[in-house]
C-alpha cells in the first residue's frame, strides 16, 4: 500500500512539471517504477529546472527586442513632430474654429496656458511572457492625461444681458440716462416707452414748507384756471383761422358788388350778372 502511494505521488509530480515545461503529455511514459529524482552533487540540476531557466531567458530576450522597437518608434515620432512645427501649434491652427477677425477677442480673453514640452521618449511597454508562452497582464496601468479645455469667448448678447441683469427694476431709467452714449444695447420690455413716460411724470415734488430754500425745486403744475384760459384762447384762434381760410377754399374768390335797389329791377340785375354766388331772395312779393 505504501509503495502504491509513493508511485502515485511521483507520477503526479512528473506530470505537473511536464505541464509547466510545455511537454506533450501524450508521449509514452518512462518504463519501470517512477522514483523521485535524487541529487548526487551540488552541480547536478534536474531537467525541469533547466527548462524553466531557458524559458526565462527567452522571455528576457523578447522584452529587450520590444524595448528596442518602441525606442525606434518614439524617435521617428519626435522627428516628425519637430518637422511639422509641434503637434500643439498645428492642432490649434486647424481646430480653433475662429477666423482672423473674431480671433482677436479669443486671444485677448484666453487665459495663459503653459505649453507642454514634447516628451523625449514615450514610456516603454514591457510585455513579459510566462513559462508556458502566454502574455501576462501588465500590473501598472498607464495614467490617462486629461484633455486641455480652452476657454471660449462669450457672445455679445450674453455679455450685454449679464451686464444689464445686475440693475434693479426701478433703476433702469437712470441707467438709460447715464449710459445713453454707450454702444451697449438696452434690453427692455414691450411697454418700455410707457414705463419711461410714467416714471418721468411721477417725479417727486419738494414741499414749500420743508427743507432749505437753496435746494433745487421741481416745477409745479399750473393751476386749473390757467389751463381753462389756454383752452379758450386755443378755440378762438382756431375759429379765426377757419374764417380766414373759408374764402381760399373756393376756386374763384367772390368780387365785391355794389348794392342794388330793392325794386323790380333787382331780380333782373341779379339774373344778368355772371356771379357764381347763389341768389337768395328774402322778399319775393315783387315776383
Swiss-Prot record:
<dbReference type="GO" id="GO:0005737">
    <property type="term" value="C:cytoplasm"/>
</dbReference>
<feature type="compositionally biased region" description="Low complexity">
    <location>
        <begin position="138"/>
        <end position="147"/>
    </location>
</feature>
<keyword id="KW-0539">Nucleus</keyword>
<comment type="similarity">
    <text>Belongs to the INKA family.</text>
</comment>
<feature type="compositionally biased region" description="Polar residues">
    <location>
        <begin position="35"/>
        <end position="50"/>
    </location>
</feature>
<dbReference type="GO" id="GO:0030291">
    <property type="term" value="F:protein serine/threonine kinase inhibitor activity"/>
</dbReference>
<dbReference type="Pfam" id="PF15342">
    <property type="entry name" value="FAM212"/>
</dbReference>
<comment type="subunit">
    <text>Interacts with PAK4.</text>
</comment>
<dbReference type="GO" id="GO:0019901">
    <property type="term" value="F:protein kinase binding"/>
</dbReference>
<comment type="function">
    <text>Inhibitor of the serine/threonine-protein kinase PAK4. Acts by binding PAK4 in a substrate-like manner, inhibiting the protein kinase activity.</text>
</comment>
<feature type="region of interest" description="Inka box 2">
    <location>
        <begin position="261"/>
        <end position="287"/>
    </location>
</feature>
<protein>
    <recommendedName>
        <fullName>PAK4-inhibitor INKA1</fullName>
    </recommendedName>
</protein>
<dbReference type="GO" id="GO:0005634">
    <property type="term" value="C:nucleus"/>
</dbReference>
<dbReference type="InterPro" id="IPR039201">
    <property type="entry name" value="Inka"/>
</dbReference>
<feature type="region of interest" description="Disordered">
    <location>
        <begin position="138"/>
        <end position="157"/>
    </location>
</feature>
<feature type="region of interest" description="Inka box 1">
    <location>
        <begin position="168"/>
        <end position="205"/>
    </location>
</feature>
<keyword id="KW-0963">Cytoplasm</keyword>
<feature type="region of interest" description="Disordered">
    <location>
        <begin position="22"/>
        <end position="59"/>
    </location>
</feature>
<dbReference type="InterPro" id="IPR029267">
    <property type="entry name" value="FAM212"/>
</dbReference>
